[in-house]
Amino acid sequence: MSETEDVKRPRTESSTSCRNCGKEGHYARECPEADSKGDERSTTCFRCGEEGHMSRECPNEARSGAAGAMTCFRCGEAGHMSRDCPNSAKPGAAKGFECYKCGQEGHLSRDCPSSQGGSRGGYGQKRGRSGAQGGYSGDRTCYKCGDAGHISRDCPNGQGGYSGAGDRTCYKCGDAGHISRDCPNGQGGYSGAGDRKCYKCGESGHMSRECPSAGSTGSGDRACYKCGKPGHISRECPEAGGSYGGSRGGGDRTCYKCGEAGHISRDCPSS
């Protein structure tokens, strides 16, 4: 057999050596000599410290100090990883691990005991602690309350807007500090300087789907390609059951189902 054919040959049980006993034909997890140290291979279990198997196949209890290289960052003991830790988390047990919610060492954010506090949320590259809350005063700033250390979805200060210098402005009410989906001021439009303009009524401050003047034909430059009238788009056309002629707007839009101009296939009345 050539070297190329040998490389391409699929791996079978006959070509597999057990790392526990060194014999071919089975894996370590199926080894009939599981209690033996086998041929003393270099594989060492970091749970019990014995050679011949890996931690996921370990038949023994975890032992402190078994594998010096592996250290649990929850309790600080060697011999297991955090996901297998049988002990309670000890603050500061693992130096270098820092929770981004409270800023303390020794646990990750998912294990944070202060998860209900106002310090939740992300942080920027420049990290600094902001007082008793333990939150980071990095680049992230909440656009609801203006405080640093959390983002809007984690804001503990409700829906109220703020008068900070942020560039977020709601196009529904014109107030800074929140976006339209979080607006506490209802559907009312505003006469701000925003560039958002409803093409139904021609007023700024809202989009067509939120327009309080649904019956208005407006002065927008958008035209429905179904009926040719301005003020709405095809999916909102009140004349959906009408005939579709090429002279009723729609330009070069042609349905590939019926061949008529003025609509596309998903809106075809002849389907």
From Swiss-Prot:
Residues 118-136 have a biased composition (Gly residues). It comes from Leishmania major. GO terms for molecular function: DNA binding; zinc ion binding. This is DNA-binding protein HEXBP. Residues 1-12, 21-42 have a biased composition (Basic and acidic residues). Keywords: DNA-binding, Metal-binding, Nucleus, Repeat, Zinc, Zinc-finger. The keyword Repeat applies. GO terms for cellular component: nucleus. SMART domains: ZnF_C2HC. Its main location: nucleus. A zinc finger (CCHC-type) spans 16-33, 43-60, 70-87, 97-114, 140-157, 168-185, 196-213, 222-239, 253-270. The keyword Zinc-finger applies. Binds to single-stranded DNA located in the 5' hexanucleotide repeat region of the L.major leishmanolysin (GP63) gene. It is found in: Nucleus. InterPro entries: CCHC-ZF_NABP, Znf_CCHC, Znf_CCHC_sf.
